[in-house]
């Protein structure tokens, strides 16, 4: 018989830097899951990635206090900020000038990396989503 799922926990954890402090500890502790076991498994799975890169993770908690987790690709905003060379997006989008620039080639590159996590049929559709995210962050998308 399959294990009974008691809940899903969605977190964004820096790659290779998971520790039992908040937000991980309290989120897993509420479900009675072994926090240190998750920390060890997550850090081992993300050891080959760039340290500190935010990794979305979905943890499935089971009734017998076991868990499984799935890591996703980093958020679009992380890739856009890295490509534009900025620390954060604009606080006043549209009123002030753009805070950074990315090329369509960089957008397509981000789209291919994020394709499996996006709800798009092709890379061009994913690229359009990323252009929208860039605009909302105050990043200008230029051809080239």
UniProtKB/Swiss-Prot annotation:
Protein name: Large ribosomal subunit protein uL11
One Gene Ontology term of the molecular function aspect: large ribosomal subunit rRNA binding
Family, per entry: Belongs to the universal ribosomal protein uL11 family.
Quaternary structure note: Part of the ribosomal stalk of the 50S ribosomal subunit. Interacts with L10 and the large rRNA to form the base of the stalk. L10 forms an elongated spine to which L12 dimers bind in a sequential fashion forming a multimeric L10(L12)X complex.
GO cellular component: cytosolic large ribosomal subunit
Organism superkingdom: Bacteria
PANTHER family documented for this protein: 60S RIBOSOMAL PROTEIN L12 (PTHR11661), LARGE RIBOSOMAL SUBUNIT PROTEIN UL11M (PTHR11661:SF1)
Organism the protein comes from: Rhodospirillum centenum (strain ATCC 51521 / SW)
Post-translational modification summary for this protein: One or more lysine residues are methylated.
